[in-house]
Amino acid sequence: SSTWIIVASGFVEPVFYLMAFGLGLGAVIGNVTGIVDGAGNPVSYTAYIAPALLATSAMNGAIYDSTWNVFFKMHFGKLYQGILATSMGTLDVALGEITWALMRGFAYAIGFTAVISGIGAVTGDPLIRSWTGIFAILAAVLIAFGFASFGMAITSYLKSFQQMNWINFFLMPMFLFSGTFYPLSVYPEWVQWAIHAMPLWQAIEMVRGLTLGIIDAALLGHVLYFVVMIVGGLWFTTRRLRSLFLR
């Protein structure tokens, strides 16, 4: 059905990027200059972008369910009005939608991890360099939770399909410039600081550190960033739903 095609597209897109850039461009580039894993070994370009695309896959799975899906239910399906007429509250609605989006992000992360593990086994270049890479799945869940919470909060303020297009307008540059395909050191320092504030950069650095075995204090900072994102997203969402449907 068309629904499954839409669901699959969010997973397939990062896989295509990995094939085109990782295996294609990676064969020309070789190792990434100045980047080593936790054991001090050089990192191939494919191993460099694979965790970034894993984080992106988790984001894609969460963001589309918590934005377009929620937008339709809010403005056309009139689903939330019926739910809130029962004993359920706005927090229940928010957690239900966000949990569903989180599950999709988790499924994308599981599938993409299987893909990069298979590619690493076939090419002889392991894309997960450390046992800590197993925690990348848990990191993907946190990432999906954060983006789903914030995505639903933003969507609750949008009123038209034209306004919804602003979400993609923000996501694409964030995907391209958040250290997905090359280190931030290529940018001026002030640009680097601006990118540090972006949630996808935080997600990519968290997953990349785990897959490369680089465990440091910065990892905790990335985790806290998403905890704040989750709490803030839930707070804004519940307040907005209350003002829309419980006046």
Language-model region placement:
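Hydrophobic transmembrane alpha-helices and immediately adjacent juxtamembrane helices
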Residues: S1-G120, G124-I134, L138-R247
